[in-house]
Amino acid sequence: MIKTYVVTHLRKMEEGIPEGLQVVDLPMTSEERTQVRRRLETPSGLVLNLALPTGTVLQPGQILCVVEGVAYRVVAAPEEVLVIYPRSLKEAAQVGHLIGNLHRPIDLSGEVIAILYDAALEERLRNLGLVVVREMRSFAKTPLPGHSH
């Protein structure tokens, strides 16, 4: 018999993981972390039916739920990204301008900018003379203030 658990709310990130619990990581791509109304099967076969509020975005490190002494934690799954290595402030500004105009999410880590893979965007970045490397790695978009048109 398949066990099913319905997830309707999330623990606060600052609550952390209670001591004594086993932790099971649930790898999810950045797109999957926005799909909060779906069926998710854990490695042990437990089915989690996500029924979270519209607009919820799951964050890496967040505890999705605790069931029978097991904490299910969201982790960023490796996915195809473009990693841009700006060599100057001017190059970083060019990247920011181009990606910002396209309203694409970015992952800022250290001195590099990562974006989800897009062949046309890769070509545009290379045509600007930027150092761009295609990699498989986790992508956790950096929360930045937004605006609307």
Curated annotation (Swiss-Prot):
Any one GO BP annotation for this protein: urea metabolic process
Main subcellular location of this protein, as a coarse class: cytoplasm
GO molecular function, one term: unfolded protein binding
Subcellular location: Cytoplasm
Pfam families from the UniProt entry: UreE_C, UreE_N
InterPro entries: UreE (IPR012406), UreE_C_dom (IPR007864), UreE_N (IPR004029), UreE_N_sf (IPR036118)
Descriptive protein name: Urease accessory protein UreE
Species annotation: Synechococcus sp. (strain JA-3-3Ab) (Cyanobacteria bacterium Yellowstone A-Prime)
